[in-house]
Amino acid sequence: MNKVKKLMSWNAFPALLLFVILLGINGVMTGGLSVSFFRSFISTNAGAICVAIGVTATILVAGTDISLGSIVSLVNVVIVTAFEKGFSVPQAALLGLLTAVLCGMFNGFVVGIMRVNPLLATFATSIAFAGIALWILPYPGGYIDFTFGDWYLGNMFGIIPTPVVLIAILVLIWIFVMKLPVGLHIYALGKDVKKAYASGINVAALRFFVHTFAGLAAGVAGICISANICAGSPTVGSAMSMNSIAAAVIGGVSLNGGIGGIWGGIFGASFLSILISIVVSANLSSIVQSFIQGLILLIGVTVSIAASDKEIKTKIKRAIGGKR
């Protein structure tokens, strides 16, 4: 019983529950859930999950990063250009990853060292990165070696789908960081910036790190998307930044910082992805699709915030019990 209560009090539980419910609905609509469905789901949505992991890290320190979608687009066009220049699959992937990490480091420098507001800083860099992507590849197209796609859709270590391994690498890096003193410092910074400064925590270094990690996550996302579509587009990640923030909130991550974790981002992104899949498969008009997605997203965010906010929980219990 204690384990059940502990699970239900977990910040990411509402997102996990919503995902499982929609997964069941999707199974009913499609006649069942198969291994091929899960492989297709993870290969299609691994990029969104990776971006959600990255933005969650920045939100935990009471910040955000709305440039990750533009970084994904930039990675995509860099990989396309690399293949057109004759680079091999590993070389193109590493070049794309390096580009993303450098973008993340630049964000970390502006936010952490220069102390520019994270929202304003990453809004500016988002426009800059998107502009660079358009300069490199002005229109969709380009060439990506199909062996890149074959590698992505295959298995690593014999049985594990490649997208799962790529996501797991990010998760393991974050878990390792959380085991170190810096993990506690990240949550301390998110809960109270002034106290973090007063206690001697290196705030600039922490913010630099989380934005660099977010850049790495966006780089992995760019690799996933590029390998999955085997084509280039300078706007492929344009909608990912805001969706990833919504995913984090649905996953119980407080926008004020210091509450939640990357599992919330993962389950929140999974929920959004399965929601989009269900709405699209219903063959509704685009207007109705957008309305339903927005409505369910609003409900999901509201439920998650209500479930993770103790004050709101208390008010709901009082309202239900008729107490004032």
PLM region descriptions:
Residues 31, 114, 118-180, 206-209, ...:
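Transmembrane helix-bundle core of multi-pass membrane transporters
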Residues 29-41, 136-138, 177, 210-248, ...:
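Inter-helical junctions in multi-pass inner-membrane proteins, predominant
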Residues 88-94, 102-107, 111, 156-232:
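Helix-loop-helix "hairpin" substructures at the membrane interface of multi-pass membrane proteins
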Residues 218, 228, 232-294:
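Transmembrane alpha-helical segments in multi-pass inner-membrane proteins
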Residues 3-7, 102-144, 179-181, 245-261:
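Short loop segments and helix-boundary regions at transmembrane helix junctions
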Residues 21-85, 110-115, 247, 252-262, ...:
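Single transmembrane alpha-helix segments in multi-pass membrane proteins
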Residues 18-34, 61, 133-138, 175-181, ...:
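Structural signal for alpha-helical transmembrane segments and their membrane-water exit/capping regions
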Residues 1-20, 24, 171-172, 191, ...:
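Cytosolic-side transmembrane-helix boundaries in multi-pass membrane proteins
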